[in-house]
Every structure is written in C-alpha cells, then in structure tokens.
C-alpha cells in the first residue's frame, strides 16, 4: 500500500501510484487511497459490464404499433410489410422472453421472407429493426454460399458475421438478426428434384435448414472452411431471427397463372391479367414460392411472408426528404459545414426520382445520382468563401447544367439568372 512518501511528504494512489499533485482528487480509505482517474476508469468498466447484461435481455420489447412508428421515421411507404414485420418481430422476442414455452405449449420461431423489387427497402427495413431492438445485425449474400465441400462460403460463415457484429459475445449474438439477401438466387433450377447436384441452389437451401430452425452450430472463428485441427465457436441459432429477402423476378407470372386458373370458367372474368405486379406480389402464397424453386422444407421455416411494392416517383421524392437520415438532409448538412446553404428545388427532386425509376434501381440508386450531381459542387465550394447558397434546379439534374449560386453580395450566378 502507498501511504506517505517520506521524502516529499505526499500521498499516492494505491492503484496507479500517481501522487496527489498529479491528480485532481485523492479519496482516502482505511489505509488506502484512490485517485479520480482510477474512479472514472472503474465506473466505465462497471457500466460497460452492466450495459452488456442489459442488452442481452429483452424485457421491454416495443409493441407492434411502436415498432411501425419507428420504422416510419426511416422507411417511406411499405405499410403492409411494416405491419407484418412489426408483428413477427414482437412475437419473436416475446417468445424468447417466455423461454419458448407457455403452459407446455412450444412457441415456434417466425422467420420472415421479404419479397420485393430491387431498391424497395428490404435491407433497410431489416437494419432498422435491429437498430430499434438494439441487437447485433449481420447481412449475408446468398449467392456467395455453396453446399459444404464445394468452392464458396459455408453457411456457418453467416453466423460468424453475426458473432463479429456482437464483438464475439456469443450470448448476445444468439438473440440477433440475420438478413440473407438474394435468397431467390438459390432457388433450384426446376420444380422437379434433379438427379444432378445443385450445390449453389437446392444444396444451399438444404444447408440453411438447420440454422433457420435452430441448432447448435460450430463456427470457425476466422471464417473460411472447417478443418479438424481448429477450435470452433459454438452458437445456438434457436433464438436468432432470420429475414430472407429477394426480388423473385418472374414470380408474378406464377401468381397470375394460379389466379387465372381459379377464375377461368363459364361466365367468369379473368381478372388476373389486369392485376399490376405490386398487387400480384401482395397475393403471394407458399405454393408460389414452391413453384419458383424453393424447397418445401425451406418455405416451412419462413412462415411470415411480406411483400414490398415498387416505389413510384412520389415515394422516391419522400425518401429523399422525409426520413431522419434522408439524403437531402445529409448533403445539406455537409455543405452547412462549409458555411453554404444547399437547396433542392421540387423539380430537381422529381427529376432525380425519374432517373432512379429509369435505371430500375429504386431507392438504392438515389445516392449515386445525387453524388454525380453534387461532385463538382463539393469539389469547388470548399475553395470559395464568396458563396452563400447553392440551388440545385431541375435543369441541373435533367440537362447537367451548373447549379444556381447566390453570392454573399447578393449576386445570383448560373442558368441565365446572373444579376447584381
């Protein structure tokens, strides 16, 4: 124990050894002293430990309506999909809290299948759900997976991504969310079972079955293929929520045929031919997924099916401006840091939305379009201190014209509006 330094007559911290002159405060106990820096360090350690314990528990899971309200802050439209997701997620974590059994009734897991076109918000919905619940989240691409023993990734590597997202806290990872994208790409090549091996299609579905349902999986800590001379991380997937998303191009034709077969008959109207793609997707059933190429066992482990609509121009404009992390808000903030006000005219927003629709990229393509428009602006503006405002017009987006600039002396420059 450190007490008095006989030469200098000073007290020292019993933990770090610093003298009372080197710290702001020294607290005395029975024959022991601790400085304010060590107290702060101990507090952080305790808070971190307690915080980790609290995050693993899900005693206050938001109600479905609360989940949908928070989703509305980040994701525009897709109301039916939000409602389906909110109920499924609430029931999933309610099941975890009840230890999966209520009065000897076993509650099964509600994994989710998201069906919708590219850029409709499938990944964003899954990410936002994980953020709401404060659980680890991982994204995997189904196209990179192959059956064990073939070139490609093992399905266990999906679990490794989740463990890494949880900072290797396995208990925390066991209550996380995994989003598997492009799940439609692992559909088998034909509806009838093949005698040839389909290692990146049906083989992947077979490999995913166990982890979707719930099993104790052995995960290589460094990823890659398993070999017998390495240690494994054991993780129970029973309480991991799996969300599988895909565009399922062509499934609307399968739905249309099913609906058409049911309405064809004497004196009946074939309404299926008149239904829009979005309306058809909302009528998807497990039997349609079976005809598309998913195996029955795989479909059975994804009991919740939610369909997303193609985003129209109005929805894309709202995505640009309304969410908390809207792209327009982000770019305005970036220019604000250079003391320049940024404005997007309504016509400019409409033109950006039209370009995204033309490219068939949905909301996913909005950022690259704005980045192209803003490149010269963000390159030149930091070097100029005479600009007060930058206005992105419809002509800037549609025709590539320079944006309108308002100088600090009131002069307006650009697009035939030069004035003093």
Swiss-Prot record:
Source taxon at top rank: Bacteria
SMART domains in alphabetical order: AAA, ClpB_D2-small, zf-C4_ClpX
Stored InterPro entries: AAA+_ATPase, ATP-dep_Clp_protease_ClpX, ATPase_AAA_core, Clp_ATPase_C, Clp_protease_ATP-bd_su_ClpX, ClpX_bact, P-loop_NTPase, Znf_CppX_C4
Single biological process term from Gene Ontology: proteolysis involved in protein catabolic process
Residues binding ATP, per UniProt: 117-124
Domain ClpX-type ZB: 1-54
GO CC annotation: HslUV protease complex
Positions of Zn(2+) binding: 13, 16, 35, 38
Annotated Pfam families: AAA_2 (PF07724), ClpB_D2-small (PF10431), zf-C4_ClpX (PF06689)
GO molecular function, one term: ATP hydrolysis activity
Protein keywords: ATP-binding, Chaperone, Metal-binding, Nucleotide-binding, Zinc
Coiled-coil ranges (or none): none
Function: ATP-dependent specificity component of the Clp protease. It directs the protease to specific substrates. Can perform chaperone functions in the absence of ClpP.
Assembly and binders: Component of the ClpX-ClpP complex. Forms a hexameric ring that, in the presence of ATP, binds to fourteen ClpP subunits assembled into a disk-like structure with a central cavity, resembling the structure of eukaryotic proteasomes.
Family note: Belongs to the ClpX chaperone family.
Protein known as: ATP-dependent Clp protease ATP-binding subunit ClpX
Organism for this UniProt entry: Bacillus velezensis (strain DSM 23117 / BGSC 10A6 / LMG 26770 / FZB42) (Bacillus amyloliquefaciens subsp. plantarum)
């Amino acid at each position: 124990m450190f007490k008095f330094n006989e030469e200098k007559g000073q007290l020292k911290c019993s933990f770090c050894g610093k003298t009372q002159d080197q710290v702001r405060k020294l607290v005395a106990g029975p024959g022991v002293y601790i400085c304010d820096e060590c107290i702060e360090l101990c507090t952080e350690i305790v808070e971190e430990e307690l915080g980790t314990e609290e995050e693993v528990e899900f005693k206050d899971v938001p109600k479905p309506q609360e989940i949908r309200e928070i989703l509305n802050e980040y994701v525009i439209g897709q109301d039916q999909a939000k409602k389906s997701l909110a109920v499924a997620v609430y029931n999933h974590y309610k099941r975890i809290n009840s230890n999966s059994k209520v009065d000897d009734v076993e509650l099964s897991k509600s994994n989710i299948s998201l069906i919708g076109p590219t850029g409709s918000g499938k990944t964003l919905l899954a990410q936002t759900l994980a953020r709401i619940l404060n659980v680890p989240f991982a994204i995997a691409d189904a196209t990179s997976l192959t059956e064990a023993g073939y070139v490609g990734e093992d399905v266990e590597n999906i679990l490794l991504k989740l463990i890494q997202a949880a900072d290797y806290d396995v208990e925390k990872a066991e209550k996380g969310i995994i989003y598997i994208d492009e799940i439609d790409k692992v559909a088998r090549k034909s509806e009838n079972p093949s005698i040839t091996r389909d290692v990146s299609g049906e083989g992947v579905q077979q490999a995913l079955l166990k982890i979707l349902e719930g099993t104790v999986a052995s995960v290589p800590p460094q990823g890659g293929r398993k070999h017998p001379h390495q240690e494994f991380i054991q993780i129970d997937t029973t309480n991991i929520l799996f969300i599988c998303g895909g565009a399922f191009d062509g499934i609307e034709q399968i739905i249309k045929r099913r609906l058409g077969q049911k309405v064809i008959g004497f004196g009946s109207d074939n309404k299926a031919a008149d239904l829009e793609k979005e309306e058809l997707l909302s009528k998807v059933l497990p039997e349609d997924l079976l005809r598309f190429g998913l195996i029955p066992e795989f479909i059975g482990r994804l009991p919740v099916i939610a369909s997303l609509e193609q985003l129209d121009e109005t929805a894309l404009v709202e995505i640009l401006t309304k969410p908390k992390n809207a792209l327009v808000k982000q770019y305005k903030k970036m220019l604000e840091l250079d003391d320049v006000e940024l404005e997007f005219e309504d016509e400019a927003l409409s033109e950006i939305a039209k370009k995204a629709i033309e490219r068939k990229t949905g909301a996913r393509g909005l950022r690259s379009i704005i980045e192209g428009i803003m490149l010269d602006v963000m390159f030149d503006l930091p070097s100029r201190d005479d600009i007060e405002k930058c206005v992105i017009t419809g002509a800037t987006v549609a025709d590539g014209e320079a944006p309108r600039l308002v100088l600090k002396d009131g002069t307006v420059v650009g697009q035939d509006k030069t004035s003093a």
